Amino acid sequence: MSVVALVPAAGRGVRLGAGVPKALVPVAGESLLSRAVRGLHDSGRVRHVVVAAPADEVPAVEAELASLRSFVHVVPGGAERTDSVRLALAEAERVVPDARVVLVHDAARAFTPPSVVRDVVRAVEEGAPAVVPVLPVADTIKQVDEAGDVETTVDRSRLRTVQTPQGFAIDVLRQAYAAAGDIATDDAGLVERIGGKVSTVPGHPHALKITTAFDLAIAEAVLA
């Protein structure tokens, strides 16, 4: 099956405080976006990637990904993440009309191992309509009331943190976005809303989401 990947990277990432769009923040000399796209490439399973970038940063993003030019298309993203995914999906279907599997990947998860990408693709190819990589929750989880007082301790044995890339049969993702509203942060959640089944594969600790300056410092320390 032909596999395409979408990277919605039009956000500004103000929490990172780097003065540039989060996707272009460098870690050890290479941007988060470049590392994320390279991981998709190195999986050996993705035919093409479409990046949705800030409209005024498209030339900069194209320059950043110049070494992967034949593998990547860059399109202007939208005001919301859902807009960017829709725009990237339309471009992916234009560029690779026979695509049957689509991945949606966060540039902020720049260190996701290629093996995780392969596992997600394999699960979709084997029949799962939607797949997410997950890790067990390590922290104790408390449920609180409106005043902030603890109501109960949640059984964490069935809880998982979700990573990316999330994988989908392309028609399933298309249907989910056709039914979606304007704002959503989790693509698999949209599949859940239309009654679709979402399966899991093991994630990886290296696929942490880089959101704050502290996260960035951790990533730099790991690479040092």
From Swiss-Prot:
GO annotation terms (biological process): isopentenyl diphosphate biosynthetic process, methylerythritol 4-phosphate pathway
GO molecular function: 2-C-methyl-D-erythritol 4-phosphate cytidylyltransferase activity
SUPFAM superfamilies the record matches: Nucleotide-diphospho-sugar transferases (SSF53448)
Site feature Transition state stabilizer, where: 15, 22
Keyword match DNA-binding: no
Role: Catalyzes the formation of 4-diphosphocytidyl-2-C-methyl-D-erythritol from CTP and 2-C-methyl-D-erythritol 4-phosphate (MEP).
PANTHER family: 2-C-METHYL-D-ERYTHRITOL 4-PHOSPHATE CYTIDYLYLTRANSFERASE, CHLOROPLASTIC (PTHR32125:SF4)
Protein name, per record: 2-C-methyl-D-erythritol 4-phosphate cytidylyltransferase
Gene: ispD
